[in-house]
């Protein structure tokens, strides 16, 4: 009698577990993400996955939105979380890059007030990408949006005389990518201003003070 009750209990537990994770036995941590539109404080976040995009990855990346400064997020009107194939296709179609090799080096991009984020977990086939990498890339892209929405006359924050002067003195001050142009120099400096302010001060106190002076309302 006790054995029968025990077996019934085990069967019941198995049934309940299958109900939770599906009869296929698929772990909820391995569930594939579905195309959907999420909302973050009024900002639509479009999820554009493929058959390899895990919901767990989307959840982790979505959490990075709340770690962004409000004064950066408020300028953004929409965000796209794109699987690598969709992200690369858009980069090629819109002429941002000349070939897939160039596109594979890029983790995020912006068009005016829209941010596009590559949701891959590896780049170049073997380099791991985690939520912290995603967070920092998102911050970089949001500084581009900030730059695009804070024009004063014919001048943008990234082509301010102070930025241009510091950049011209040492284009590689913030690394190879920052040396690309003043737009990337500005976004790289903005990212460092948020996550490594002391490091930015060491590299250029004038650059740090410039970011301190920017409007953050």
Residue ranges of predicted features:
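Catalytic Zn2+-binding segment of zinc metalloproteases
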Residues: 141-158
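C-terminal motif of bacterial Sec signal peptides marking the signal peptidase cleavage site
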Residues: 20-22
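Metalloprotease/metallohydrolase-associated module, dominated by Zn2+-dependent proteases
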Residues: 158-217
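Auxiliary, metal-adjacent structural segments of Zn-dependent hydrolase domains
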Residues: 40-116
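Bacterial signal peptide processing site
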Residues: 24-26
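Hydrophobic (often cysteine-bearing) scaffold residues that line and stabilize catalytic clefts
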Residues: 8, 131, 135, 183
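Short pre-active-site segment immediately N-terminal to the catalytic Zn-binding motif
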Residues: 117-138
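Bacterial N-terminal signal peptides that target proteins for export
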Residues: 1-10
């Amino acid at each position: 009698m006790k054995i029968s009750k025990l077996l019934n209990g085990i069967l019941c537990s198995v049934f309940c577990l299958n109900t939770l994770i599906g009869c296929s036995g698929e772990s909820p941590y391995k569930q594939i993400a579905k195309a959907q539109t999420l909302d973050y404080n009024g900002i639509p976040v479009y999820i554009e996955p493929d058959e390899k995009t895990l919901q767990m990855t989307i959840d982790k990346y979505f959490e990075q939105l709340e770690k962004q400064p409000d004064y950066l997020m408020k300028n953004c009107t929409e965000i796209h979380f794109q699987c690598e194939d969709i992200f690369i296709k858009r980069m090629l179609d819109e002429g941002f890059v000349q070939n897939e090799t160039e596109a594979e080096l890029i983790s995020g991009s912006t068009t005016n007030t829209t941010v596009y984020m590559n949701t891959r977990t590896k780049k170049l086939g073997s380099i791991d990408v985690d939520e912290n990498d995603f967070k920092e890339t998102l911050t970089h892209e949001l500084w581009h949006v900030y730059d695009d929405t804070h024009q004063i006359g014919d001048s943008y924050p990234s082509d301010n005389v102070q930025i241009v002067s510091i950049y011209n003195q040492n284009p590689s001050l913030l690394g190879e990518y920052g040396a690309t142009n003043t737009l990337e120099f500005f976004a790289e400096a903005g990212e460092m201003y948020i996550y490594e302010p002391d490091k930015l001060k060491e590299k250029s106190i004038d650059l740090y003070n410039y970011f301190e002076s920017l409007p953050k309302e």
